[in-house]
Amino acid sequence: NVNIQGGTKRMRYFTSAEYYNQQGLFKEFSQDEYGNKSNSSFKRFAFRANLDFLMTKDLTLSVNFGTRFEERRGPNSNESRDGTYSQAFYEMNHTPGWLFPVSYTVGEGEDQKTLYSGSSQYQNNIVARFAKAGFYRSTNTINETNFIVDYKMDWLTKGLAAKGMVSFDYDAYYMRAFNADFATYELNDRTNYNSIDAYTQFNTDTELAYLGNNQTTTYKL
């Protein structure tokens, strides 16, 4: 966060610039080839400028402008986190930790493949959901501007003043979401664990599918 202020006899100014970056609680598991992350993140870029123009000893004109750009990313397709995170914590509480490892590795060299563990009863691997089940991304741009006229009338009555203000606000929100199904595997033949034939597959890996978007734009005067 950087602030700069100053001025002259006829003008005063204050400016502020901010960058904020917050990451989620989870490790990065994503295997998305497009570079989208499985962990949640929130970024904000903000700028503000306040300008006061002393037109006369009694008349002051002010312009205040603020803008911020926010970006949110997260796993799966539920920006409210009610779906993905609630389901993750539910599965952690209801899946025995000793039942199976998080994943298996089969094959050798460049042919190695990660298989996410599961069973006929517990097919929803939490790590697999974060790594492969999709993501959302939303952006929000907010502009706030106001114009103020302040006129002191001490010449008429001491302490008397008139002030007027006009404000204009702009808010644009856009969110898009993608989703995919994922497979889990149960090891049946422990003597041949390096071969995919030793596993029973539940569900199927699918390509990311576009779920749609949500877009709103608001103007206020």
Which residues does each predicted region cover?
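Low-complexity, intrinsically disordered or weakly predicted helical/coil tracts enriched
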Residues: 50, 146-148
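Surface-exposed, low-complexity/disordered Ser/Thr/Gly/Pro/Asn-rich loops and linkers
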Residues: 128-130
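Active-site-adjacent bridging/hinge elements
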Residues: 114-125, 195-204
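Small-side-chain secondary-structure face that scaffolds active or pore-lining regions
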Residues: 20-44, 72-79, 134, 138-144, ...
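Flexible loop and strand-edge segments within Gram-negative outer membrane beta-barrel domains
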Residues: 1-18, 22-25, 38-123, 136-140, ...
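Intrinsic disorder/low-complexity detector
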Residues: 5, 113, 148, 191, ...
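Membrane-embedded beta-strand positions of outer-membrane beta-barrel proteins
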Residues: 15, 63, 147, 162-164
